[in-house]
Amino acid sequence: GPNLNLLEHRNKDVYGIVSFDDYYLKLKQQYAIQIDYYQSNIEGELIDKIQEVGFTYDYIILNAGGYTHTSIAIADCLELISCPVIEVHISNIYSRETVRQKSLLSKHCMGCIVGLGLNSYKLAIDHIISG
């Protein structure tokens, strides 16, 4: 999702000091499954990627960042695909500004993990593996 490419420059108390690229490399080493990562700041590119993999991947773990609260287009895309989606957020969106407390995407996701830092991704993978 948007701004993950600059994660280590955000509020350190919420987002930590590790870049997402570094975290992703460590995450891949922990599991004997294929884990692909795609990041874009452009809504249309995110939709294109979801459409590309949404009928062939086993799962999508999606952090749509700010688009979570604004993108009807991403919500519509999630409704169309057959792949189950787990929505994750590093911060607790429900403890943030009012505009950030509503997800347009959640109703199209099998579950949501919020506010547990980068560990949210690991928890999503653990759920997928437990199956």
Regions found by a protein language model. Give the residues of each.
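N-terminal beta1-alpha1 ligand-phosphate binding loop
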Residues: 1-18
